[in-house]
Amino acid sequence: MSELECPGLPASWLNAWLAAVGITALVPEMRLSWTDGPAPQGLLATSDGRDPVRALTSAWPSPERIAEMPIAEQLHGCEDIVPNLPLRTFRERAERFRGHDDSWSISSTYTDLHVDETQPGVVLAARSRFAPPAPGPVGPIHRRLTRVFGFVDEPFAQITATLEGGARRVNANGLGFDISRVTTLADDSDKSVDPVLEVLAFFGLSLLPIRGAGTRRTAQSRSAYLAARQRLWFLDSDDGRRHRLMWPAWSHSLGRNGIDALLDAWSPLNRGTWRRLGVHAGWRSVEYRWQGNDPTRGIGSEAL
């Protein structure tokens, strides 16, 4: 297999980890593992011997695919997608696009297995933590994806730069959860992201569906035990009141289905399972603490 080490995909950086997983979602022949040592980096290999960069360039999504995704903000014949999504709108999209290749874009963003009834007269589908609300023109997650996708006009060159760790950043908010776009509280400069990484990270979400236990969130019931939970979000053992994202690095070269199986089997708080699965490192989320009315969100990491 043709193998490529990617300094631009450090496993400790959540968006880079998601991007690496997203590559396997876009390229069925792609295999992913992580280097050993204190700072694991992505290792990409193709089962058919193709150069990983050229294979990914060939599979880069078209503008039509992005525009016609089931999660698209506006689609003919459907109610518009808004950040606080009415349950009826979610169900309309889920039913219409059942079996669609990108139906995961709905199930990794919203769920009807936990609903929000905290606002009188409206029932909302639970929303992923990866689709944080954003004010004004930033809009819902598909609008953010579309904007950042538009910055990728030379896929081969830009993919190469991203994997090498030398990508040129652009002034954009990206998907809205990359901690590296946040500087300091005193810095009100424009946020910047790597557009290739953000697009790939979105496809990485295809392996992280959001689910629930058929419960309701009301003004009287807000328990973390009953909340919707996305794959890899675990109840925090430190306080038992919030969920934290936890993700692994592994040594075996795995395709999308293999990664899917590993994420099902991995128990981050039971280190006895790590070696059996080839997992040699893991991280948990540390979220940006905003102040006042600051709408900024971001997810960083600390080693498990």
Located regions from the model:
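Short amphipathic alpha-helical surface micro-motifs
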Residues: 158-159, 175-176, 225-229
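A generic structural signal for short, non-catalytic loop/turn and secondary-structure boundary residues
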Residues: 168-170, 187, 240
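Amphipathic interfacial helices
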Residues: 177-193
